[in-house]
Design a protein with these regions (language model features):
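Extracytosolic ligand-binding ectodomains
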Residues: 1-249
Length: 249
């Protein structure tokens, strides 16, 4: 529990009022309470508002040690700035939705340096390097947002499953995802060469095991791909990786 590890005993959340934000806030509150922390408030907000002053007053009542920004940058930009301008002296914690260098620049790195966040993590593997190099060659920059690598893997897996099935309908793709993503089979990776190899092996009737840019793509019994959680930090106005935490379903 990162919040307790950082010494926070009281917390409030500001979360975007949809399934994503609600789920994050509820799961954080449950884990924080189980670790001995006190949740002072869980405050929903709509995505597009000129001000979040009313919601912020509720979230900061009782002066929590930490305010969790469980939103998207366009909203968090506003309410974090309002919190700082209003004199809030506590800390902030971020999620994948607020892992944004644009947010850091808009709010001001001087206010956010030293703060932490979490995101589903991808270790630095050869597969990730191949993907990043290909992305940069095509777009002139490294992937700017979280989950671009995993979105890429999802598209590749659907294509490989369709090839394995010999059909491109939803049911056939679904039923062949594990056949191309999970062991056993020859390991194949992302990139033009990796995908060509995978397609050739499938055409020859061989089993494959796609290991993606976002890490292992093995589906568990519930159809989930479980990845490590990456803890990141804002240092000198930049977002830097700190460490990975293994998740046990």
């Amino acid at each position: 529990m990162l919040a307790k590890e950082l010494g926070f005993n009281t917390a409030s959340t500001m979360y975007v009022n949809n399934a994503y934000g609600q789920g994050l806030s509820q799961e954080f509150a449950k884990a924080f309470k189980a670790a001995g922390g006190t949740v002072l408030a869980e405050v929903p907000h709509e995505q597009v508002q000129p001000t979040y002053a009313a919601e912020l007053r509720r979230a900061l009542q009782g002066n929590p040690d930490v305010l969790l920004a469980l939103s998207y940058p366009e909203s968090a930009n506003i309410y974090l700035t309002e919190a700082i301008e209003g004199g809030y002296k506590g800390e902030f914690l971020f999620c994948d939705g607020t892992q944004s260098i644009d947010l850091v620049n808009r709010v001001g790195a001087q206010y956010l340096n030293g703060t932490y966040g979490t995101v589903a993590g991808t270790a630095e593997t050869d597969a990730l390097r191949i993907f990043k190099e290909a992305y940069e060659a095509e777009y002139g920059e490294l992937p700017p947002q979280p989950y671009i690598d995993t979105a890429y893997d999802a598209v590749v897996l659907m294509a490989l499953a369709a090839q394995k099935a010999g059909k491109a309908d939803g049911t056939s793709i679904r039923d062949n995802l594990r056949a191309v993503a999970n062991p056993p089979g020859e390991v194949v990776g992302p990139g033009v060469d990796g995908i060509k190899k995978a397609l050739d092996l499938i055409k020859k009737g061989k089993d494959i095991n796609y290991e993606g840019a976002g890490g292992s793509q093995d589906f568990d019994e519930y159809g989930n791909v479980v990845t490590p959680i990456k803890i990141w930090k804002i240092e000198n106005g930049q977002i830097v990786d700190v460490r990975f935490v293994t998740v046990t379903p």
